[in-house]
A protein has these predicted regions:
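Short acidic, glycine/serine/threonine-rich loops at helix termini
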Residues: 1, 37-43, 107-109, 140-145, ...
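Proline-centered loop/turn at the N-terminus of a beta-strand
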Residues: 25, 127-129, 155
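Conserved residues at the C-terminal ends of beta-strands
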Residues: 29, 100, 160
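Active-site PLP attachment segment
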Residues: 151-169
Length: 169
């Protein structure tokens, strides 16, 4: 919601959002086939659409310029940069980059430090908020949050299920 607030009014009394009139684009981690099934950020309709579920809804949202979702090849900073160059101008604006540091629902693939550093620097240069999803990678890091080991400073961190460190009563 915070990312969409830069594009759409919350209510009639709100000020004009900075990117009103542009189509928000969400960048998420791709699966090996270039699809969106590797990213998982929850079970809300929005996060399910980010993952490629509800394809009819996703197609309609894109067709009507409400928002667009594009997958980024795993650990491919050049692909990320290409998408930013293509989708962060004119009628489009990259609304956010959402990713796990370890794709736990896709074989526990770890993002490289180089990929994270380069993509996060591009995001900073282009006013693109970053959400690091630590839902399943929390607590087993000596730094509590794995993003600290990557020396990155995301705008948003999703935390939760991993806090018990795999120990459940």
């Amino acid at each position: 919601k915070m990312m969409l607030a830069r594009f759409y009014h919350l209510d009639a009394t709100a000020e004009e959002p900075p990117y009103a009139g542009r189509t928000p684009v969400f960048l998420v981690m791709a699966d090996h086939a270039g699809g969106r099934t590797a990213n998982y950020h929850g079970t809300t309709v929005l996060t399910q659409v980010l993952r490629g579920m509800w394809p009819g809804l996703s197609d309609s949202l894109e067709e009507h310029g409400q928002y667009v979702v594009r997958p980024v090849a795993i650990n491919d900073a050049e692909h990320f940069e290409q998408l930013v160059d293509e989708l962060d101008y004119g009628p489009y604006k990259v609304a956010g980059f959402l990713h796990e540091l370890v794709l736990m629902n896709y074989g526990a693939i770890k993002l490289t430090a180089e990929f994270v550093a380069r993509t996060h620097a591009l995001c900073k240069d282009h006013d693109i908020p970053i959400l690091v999803d630590e839902i399943q990678s929390c607590i087993w890091s000596p730094e509590i949050f794995l993003f600290r080991e990557y020396a990155c400073r995301p705008d948003f961190v999703s935390a939760g299920k991993g806090f018990p460190g795999g120990e459940y009563a």
